[in-house]
Amino acid sequence: MTEMQKKYYDKRGALLVKNLKNRHFDAYYCSTKEEALEKALSLIPVGDSVGWGGCMSCQQIGLLDAVRAGEYRVIDRDACKTMEERETAMRHCLLADTFLTGANALSMDGQMVNIDGNGNRVAAIVYGPKQVIVVAGMNKVEDNLDAAINRARTVAAPMNQQRFGLPNPCGATGTCGDCKSETCICNQILITRHCKNARIKIVLVGEDLGF
């Protein structure tokens, strides 16, 4: 990352934190992955039950490995050996003390956009876990809500499709086909425009993370 890009992220990050707090999110800006990991861990009480949705950003800063190694009651869907066990773990995550996730996009006015196939991730963001910790790189930030929704649909979803390898049109074309296939990963689009009692804690990272 160039020095100019770092300054750009730092300045936008400071403004976005202010705008998120105006919407009653708990928000933090960390310049590096290392700072973000330290901040995220400081928000999780020892002994908490902790689960997560699919979250490359959490993985990239080392948060998932740190939680697995820490003094927490971990609901690890990635350790499940069968699809039935995985589905059960995903349901248990909805009642976790702490739920970890990323964001597909954020708008500079402080709104968060997430797109989901199964719906477990957006469900946990809306209700269930006592707190939600969101890790998001500054590459996820767009100037306005329309651009954030567009990013979720035309950037995040097609890139995640490459990871999943499902037979959806965007896997072949690299762009959203507005599909209605059974394997569609864009069944739910969630806009979180306001947060109750700082339940959602957003850790912004001044680096490019996730998709």
Regions found by a protein language model. Give the residues of each.
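N-terminal start-of-chain detector that recognizes signal peptides
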Residues: 1-2, 21-24, 71-74, 85-87, ...
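Conserved phosphate- and dinucleotide-binding cores of soluble alpha/beta proteins
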Residues: 94-211
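Short, flexible active-site loop motifs that bind/organize anionic cofactors or intermediates
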Residues: 3, 25-27, 138
